[in-house]
């Protein structure tokens, strides 16, 4: 492709609203442009990268036995109401009405549509297992779109769905697609980890996320320093044991703590360690209000609270709800005096506290010498806190460290969550009606492009891995007015294309500095500069990833490039 014919508008300055490297560079290099908050156009070079990621995805999905189809982006509300997610999915689901007031959603995901499709067509175990996938635009009404393609309102996604007669069949396909995902991200050149995850609004049980390691990732990965254990911090269980002190219990005492609300403030004011404080929080679990207790130096994990109750929605109670329930402000909450009709659950660590501290449910006061079970009752002790760095790894090997990650893929064992809700059944080999067993497998295709850009860049621009680069080689005649340079550039361009390489020829009448700056921004793997030594049959070859350059004779160029790109 000749650069003079390409729409690739570059920017010299960093856009003010672009917070992270991938967002900045994809805009500056002219790979995309923003249309509205969280909505982007892919320009020609960006689209080439997107298509290469799609191709890798398709190859690995088909190798794993999946078959491609295409479902509608616009989905009838009735299907979502049938599954129960019309009400539980939340405000991220983009909803609309047609001229006849019939409700629809723009697809955030396609479980309902695929289940409806398959239940009408697959009636016997003889047609199972079946794995279908699509690459389709998805829509989510993000409250705060940010980070470019990493959190948008419109994005490209590969979503696959498998249907089975037995759990063993689901396990087999799940493992196969887990490996396919590992192959996809490895072929894209990414440094990633597969981690144990929460299924969230998707439902189901076993699930893994594929996380690209990056400091700008919005997720925290908890991993062992000596084993291959890795989990999203939301899902990492705490296996610590807590020893209760043999300190004698003291008499409960209420003390004034004016203007002291946060644990750090209260512990400093009372000269008591944070681990002897009891942090009390009120959560709304579906429609039920529950008091949750953790140690003062720990944080409540709301996903674990959700899993205790098998709830659809868990959120912090509002200040108004707390005041109505316990007649105090949030900073003075405590378990003492909470009436028996309000359930209290606590993290295991709370049970070991002796002569601790808690809010007194009265503004400006706390209790000291608080002892669980003597001073208040807990209905259940369980694991409710986030794991911390330095905790024992849940697999018993090593200790936990943290890393940040960008989620690019997610695989779920949905089980019968959707098939039972939507009456999607088949006849088994005994002629009995059974619900279809399902799996679900998603990849953020456009997000993967951003993740690659986030991992592969330097101070000068993008540094694309060979497998996804828009072109393999960038040929730059420095001076287009020079017949020797122009003709040699054209000859190299044509010969490399004949060898099967994708080549970009900078045939613009621009200054050398402009050409080199754009070349660094684009980040193609190999740059061939045709300069003053063209008359001698010599060019300069530069490897973008390493910065290494060498003068090469034109007759040796193809072999030299082949060794770089092998």
UniProtKB/Swiss-Prot annotation:
GO terms for cellular component: cytosol. It is found in: Cytoplasm. Keywords: Aminoacyl-tRNA synthetase, ATP-binding, Cytoplasm, Ligase, Nucleotide-binding, Protein biosynthesis. Its EC number is 6.1.1.15. PANTHER family: MITOCHONDRIAL RIBOSOME PROTEIN L39/PROLYL-TRNA LIGASE FAMILY MEMBER (PTHR42753), PROLINE--TRNA LIGASE (PTHR42753:SF2). It is an enzyme of class 6 (ligase). Consists of three domains: the N-terminal catalytic domain, the editing domain and the C-terminal anticodon-binding domain. InterPro entries: aa-tRNA-synt_IIb, aa-tRNA-synth_II, aa-tRNA-synth_II/BPL/LPL, Anticodon-bd, Anticodon-bd_dom_sf, Pro-tRNA-ligase_IIa, Pro-tRNA-synth_IIa_bac-type, Pro-tRNA-Synthase_IIa_type1. This is Proline--tRNA ligase. HAMAP family: Pro_tRNA_synth_type1. NCBIfam families: PRK09194.1 (NF006625), proS_fam_II (TIGR00409). Belongs to the class-II aminoacyl-tRNA synthetase family. ProS type 1 subfamily. Gene3D superfamilies: Anticodon-binding domain, Bira Bifunctional Protein, Domain 2. The lineage of its organism: Bacteria, Bacillati, Bacillota, Bacilli, Bacillales. GO terms for molecular function: aminoacyl-tRNA deacylase activity; ATP binding; catalytic activity, acting on a protein; proline-tRNA ligase activity; transferase activity. It catalyses: tRNA(Pro) + L-proline + ATP = L-prolyl-tRNA(Pro) + AMP + diphosphate. CDD domains: ProRS-INS, ProRS_anticodon_short, ProRS_core_prok. Catalyzes the attachment of proline to tRNA(Pro) in a two-step reaction: proline is first activated by ATP to form Pro-AMP and then transferred to the acceptor end of tRNA(Pro). As ProRS can inadvertently accommodate and process non-cognate amino acids such as alanine and cysteine, to avoid such errors it has two additional distinct editing activities against alanine. One activity is designated as 'pretransfer' editing and involves the tRNA(Pro)-independent hydrolysis of activated Ala-AMP. One of its GO terms (biological process) is prolyl-tRNA aminoacylation. The keyword Transferase does not apply. Homodimer.
């Amino acid at each position: 492709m000749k650069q003079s014919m390409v729409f690739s508008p570059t920017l010299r300055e960093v856009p003010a609203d672009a917070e992270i490297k991938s967002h900045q560079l994809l805009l500056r290099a002219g790979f995309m442009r923003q249309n509205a908050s969280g909505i982007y156009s892919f320009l020609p070079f960006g689209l080439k990268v997107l298509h290469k990621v799609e191709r890798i995805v398709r190859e690995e999905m088909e190798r794993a036995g999946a078959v491609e189809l295409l479902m509608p982006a616009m989905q009838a509300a009735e299907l979502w109401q049938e599954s129960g997610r019309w009400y539980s999915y939340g405000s991220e689901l983009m909803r609309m009405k047609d001229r006849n007031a019939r409700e629809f959603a723009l697809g955030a995901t396609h479980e309902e549509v695929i289940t409806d499709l398959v239940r009408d067509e697959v009636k016997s175990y003889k047609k199972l297992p079946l794995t279908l996938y699509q690459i389709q635009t998805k829509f989510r009404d993000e409250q705060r779109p940010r980070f470019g393609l990493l959190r948008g309102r419109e994005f490209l996604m590969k979503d696959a769905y498998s249907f089975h007669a037995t759990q063993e069949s689901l396990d087999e396909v799940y493992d196969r697609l887990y490996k396919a995902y590992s192959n996809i991200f490895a072929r894209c050149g990414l440094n990633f980890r597969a981690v144990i995850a929460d299924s969230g609004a998707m439902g189901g049980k076993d699930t893994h996320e594929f996380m690209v390691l990056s400091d700008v990732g919005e997720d925290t990965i908890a991993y062992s320093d000596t084993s291959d254990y890795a989990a999203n911090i939301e899902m990492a269980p705490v296996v610590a044991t807590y020893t209760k002190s043999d300190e004698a219990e003291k008499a409960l005492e209420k003390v004034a703590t004016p203007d002291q609300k946060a644990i750090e403030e209260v512990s400093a004011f009372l000269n008591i360690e944070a681990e002897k404080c009891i942090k009390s929080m009120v959560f709304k679990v579906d429609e039920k209000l529950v008091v949750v207790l953790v140690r003062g130096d720990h944080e409540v994990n709301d996903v674990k609270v959700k899993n205790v109750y098998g709830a659809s929605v868990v959120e912090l109670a509002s200040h108004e709800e707390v005041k109505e329930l316990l007649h105090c402000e949030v900073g003075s909450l405590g378990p003492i005096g909470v009436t028996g009709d309000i359930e209290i659950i606590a993290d295991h660590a709370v049970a070991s506290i002796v002569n601790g501290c808690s809010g007194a449910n009265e503004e400006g006061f706390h209790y000291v010498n608080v002892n669980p079970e003597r001073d208040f009752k807990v209905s259940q002790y369980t694991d409710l806190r986030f794991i911390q760095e330095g905790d024992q790894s849940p697999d018993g090997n090593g200790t936990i460290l943290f890393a940040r990650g960008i989620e690019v893929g997610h695989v779920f064992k949905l089980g019968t969550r959707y098939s039972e809700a939507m009456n999607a059944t088949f006849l088994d080999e005994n002629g009995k009606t059974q619900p279809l067993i399902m799996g679900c497998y998603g990849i953020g295709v456009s997000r993967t492009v951003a993740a690659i850009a986030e991992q592969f860049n330097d101070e000068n621009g993008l540094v694309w891995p060979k497998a996804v680069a828009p072109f393999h080689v960038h040929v730059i005649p420095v001076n287009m007015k020079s017949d020797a340079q122009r003709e040699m550039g054209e000859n190299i361009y044509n010969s490399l294309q004949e060898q099967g390489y994708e080549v970009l020829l900078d045939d613009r009448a621009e200054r050398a500095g402009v050409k080199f700056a754009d070349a660094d921004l684009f980040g193609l793997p190999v740059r061939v500069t045709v300069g003053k030594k063209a008359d001698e049959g010599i060019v300069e070859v530069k490897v973008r990833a390493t910065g290494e350059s060498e003068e090469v004779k034109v007759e040796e160029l193809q072999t030299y490039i082949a060794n770089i790109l092998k």
